[in-house]
A protein has these predicted regions:
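Membrane interfacial helix-start motif at the N-side
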Residues: 2-15, 78, 124, 192-204, ...
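Membrane-embedded alpha-helices of multi-pass transport/permease systems
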Residues: 50-54, 58, 168-183, 187
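Intramembrane alpha-helical segments
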Residues: 5-6, 42, 72-157, 161, ...
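Extended hydrophobic alpha-helices typical of membrane-associated regions
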Residues: 212-215, 219-273
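Multi-pass membrane catalytic core of lipid/isoprenoid biosynthesis enzymes
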Residues: 38, 42, 60-110, 187-230
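The first (N-terminal) embedded transmembrane alpha-helix
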Residues: 9-26, 135-139, 263-267
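Helix-coil boundary and interhelical linker segments in multi-pass alpha-helical membrane proteins
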Residues: 22-42, 94-108, 143-164, 216-229, ...
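Generic alpha-helical transmembrane segments of integral inner-membrane proteins
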Residues: 21, 41-49, 86-97, 111, ...
Length: 273
């Protein structure tokens, strides 16, 4: 079992889980039921499993040629493609099953993120804008949480804003992460901002995306929260976004540690409403 958890990077759910619950509590007028919160957790876990596993399968040959990634389960031979396909199937059963239990509306919309999960890994073979595929995929988390409560498109502006924040934030941190592969991407003919513009210019783009992300969060605060108790968390999220850029040379710190905290800070801000 440890092999499978390591394969799908279960700890990376720390990025998406606070965001999907941010969507839930942003939409809720009262405390959601435990049942709904559990179904949302199952859906998020299933979606994360599908996304990570599809990415590993589609990129298996690229990972094999990259010294940074050639020890991953598939290129290293510790997991077969058929085993990985089985993981995708389990993730789909969990995801679609939970979406159905949440509402018929969520079940109807549930294939949309899967399309993004499939298309994104191929995008870097054609365009440097592939970073936005990561952001778009993760932005489905808070929007999914919103729909889990609302069950319709009515009054969707707050849900759209938290989704836009996630899109800009996640795209920005994916650019930071991709600086690790600047040299390999150039040699392999893969597209990314670092491989096209160089890491220095790519990090400027990442900074711009995070400025826009914080601006979106401010707009959400003014429109939907506007609570004095939430203000410190808004300010803290801005400080953390700044630190993520300031410490971008230390990808382990910026990508994994600071990012995990940002999601929970944004959730705390919404809980204060």
């Amino acid at each position: 079992m440890k092999k499978y958890f390591r394969f799908i990077k279960i700890e990376h759910t720390l990025f998406s889980l606070p965001l999907i619950y941010t969507g839930v509590f942003l939409a809720a007028e009262r405390v959601p039921s435990i049942e709904l919160l559990v179904f949302v957790l199952l859906a998020a876990t299933g979606a994360r499993t599908i996304a990570m596993t599809l990415n590993r399968i589609i990129d298996a040959e690229i990972d094999r040629r990259n010294l940074r990634t050639n020890n991953r389960e598939i290129p290293a031979g510790r997991m077969s493609l058929s085993e990985a396909a089985g993981v995708v199937l389990v993730g789909m059963l969990l995801y679609f099953g939970a979406a159905y239990l949440i509402s018929w509306f969520c079940f109807i919309l549930s294939p949309i993120p899967l399309i993004i999960f499939i298309v994104y890994p191929y995008a870097k073979r054609f365009t440097a804008l592939a970073h936005f595929g990561v952001g778009l995929g993760l932005s489905m988390a808070p929007l999914g949480g919103w729909f889990a409560v609302k069950g319709s498109l009515e009054n969707i502006l707050p849900g759209a804003l938290i989704s836009l924040f996630t899109l800009l934030w996640a795209t920005g941190f994916d650019v930071i992460y991709s600086t690790l592969d600047e040299k390999f991407d150039k040699e392999a003919g893969l597209f990314s901002f670092p491989s096209r513009f160089g890491s220095k210019k790519a990090l400027i783009i990442s900074s711009g995306l995070h400025v826009l992300a914080f601006g979106t969060l401010i707009l959400l605060f003014l429109i939907s929260i506007n609570n004095l108790w939430a203000l410190p968390f808004l300010l803290l999220s801005g400080i953390l976004l700044y630190l993520e850029q300031k410490k971008s040379a230390d990808v382990e710190l910026a990508f994994f540690k600071i990012n995990a905290v940002i999601g929970f800070v944004v959730l705390a801000m919404v809980l204060m409403k």
